[in-house]
Design a protein with these regions (language model features):
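Peripheral, non-transmembrane regulatory/ligand-interaction domains of membrane transport proteins
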Residues: 2-296, 349, 379-380
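Hydrophobic alpha-helical transmembrane segments and their immediately adjacent juxtamembrane loops
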Residues: 3-19, 285-380
Length: 380
């Protein structure tokens, strides 16, 4: 058991270990993790395994973090522990075992952190935001286009700990892929950190492509001519605002991660294998491209929103012109009938034989002339 120096871990030692009811979690072999686990193991642990020479060490039963670390100290290798939304008391057990810094522990438990990289004496603390695109057939009136989660990583010389928050960003498939690549896994905890960074950024790329399709669709609708080649009436601005809100959330995940990826790819670090560090450059390059896309999305949506509002304004002006044109046409018969509705005694045309049809013909002729003139000028 590792004991951190005072006063760094004083607040951690005061936390009481509280165990939540066991939550089933399947291992790769299909067995339920929680059925045979030591009752003292925190229930937030999704998986706990020791890896030696790129292979998972199988001792015939699930390991507790303490047992896993004891195996590593005795026989070598490293331990990888995955947790999902642990409480302070649950994570205190892990923090004491691995000597994690209290500030990093606090961030890992509380969540809602910006993507970042923090270096401590014996570990690196990295925060990633995961992004998941919600398909349109799954959207509701109050749902979001993208959903976010968090993955926090503690990288040490002989341990790697992941703390996941939110329903997205499961690392089970990634762990299985790494177990199928012993050569890479043999590189140790830094190889796992790179794989998670690459996995998260690949998710950004996929979401960026999907959001691009949504923006293209909205842009097409905004600039599609209206009926009979008329002015487009635009689209519901709420949809554009929804996309802008989701792009902003996307930007909050991507932009702060640029600096950590740059540090991991360029600055030598004691806990990062130099050979693995080269691969962080590829991740940083992909992240930079996604960041450029997200910035472009924001600017494009601003332009689309302005164009949509302009289209709506033009359409309203067109409606007002039509209303005005018809009002001008209707004014003629209104005026004529108004004149002959007055009760004057001397109105000579009232006694003319063809006075009535003449007035009707005059009214219709004037209305037709006005209609033709307005139509020629584009008011109708």
């Amino acid at each position: 058991l590792l004991v951190a120096k005072e006063p760094a871990m004083s607040m951690i030692r005061d936390l009481r270990a509280v165990v939540r009811p066991s939550r089933p979690s399947l291992r790769k072999d299909g067995g339920a993790y929680d059925t045979t686990r030591d009752p003292g193991t925190p229930s937030a642990v999704v998986d706990c395994a020791v890896y030696r020479d790129g292979a998972r060490v199988d001792i015939g039963k699930p390991l507790t973090p303490h047992e896993a670390m004891r195996l590593v100290r005795r026989d070598g290798g490293f331990v990888w522990i995955g947790l999902h939304e642990p409480t302070e008391a649950e994570f205190a057990v892990i923090a004491r075992e691995f000597g994690l810094h209290p500030l990093a522990v606090e961030d890992a438990v509380q969540a809602h952190q910006r993507p970042k990289l923090e270096r401590y004496d014996d570990s690196l603390f990295t925060v990633f935001k995961t992004i998941h695109y919600v398909e349109h057939d799954q959207l509701t009136a109050n749902s979001e286009v993208v959903e976010t989660g968090e993955v926090m990583c503690f990288t040490g010389r002989d341990f790697f700990i992941t703390v996941r928050h939110g329903g997205q960003g499961s690392l089970r498939a990634l762990r299985h892929r790494l177990q199928d690549d012993p050569e890479l896994l043999a590189r140790g905890p830094s190889a796992v950190l790179h794989s998670i960074a690459d996995h998260v950024v690949d998710g950004y790329v996929a979401v960026a492509d999907a959001v691009q399709d949504d923006i293209d669709e909205v842009e097409t609708e905004v600039f599609t001519p209206g009926r009979k080649g008329g002015v487009s009436r635009g689209v519901d601005s709420a949809r554009i605002y929804q996309l802008k809100r989701e792009v902003l959330e996307f930007k909050r995940a991507v932009s702060p991660l640029l600096r950590p990826m740059q540090l991991l790819s360029e600055r030598p670090m004691r806990l990062i294998d130099p050979d693995i560090q080269k691969y962080f450059r590829d991740v940083a390059d992909h992240l930079a491209r996604v960041h450029e896309q997200v910035i472009g999305f924001d600017e494009l949506l601003n332009s689309i929103l302005q164009a949509n509002l302009a289209q709506a304004s033009v359409a309203q002006n067109e409606d007002m012109r039509k209303i005005t044109a018809w009002a001008a046409i209707i004014a003629v018969p209104t005026m004529v009938t108004g004149v002959y509705g007055m009760n004057f005694e001397h109105m000579p045309e009232l006694h003319a034989k063809y006075g009535y049809p003449a007035v009707l013909a005059f009214t219709v002729t004037v209305c037709l002339a006005i209609h033709r003139t307005l139509k020629r000028n584009g008011w109708l």
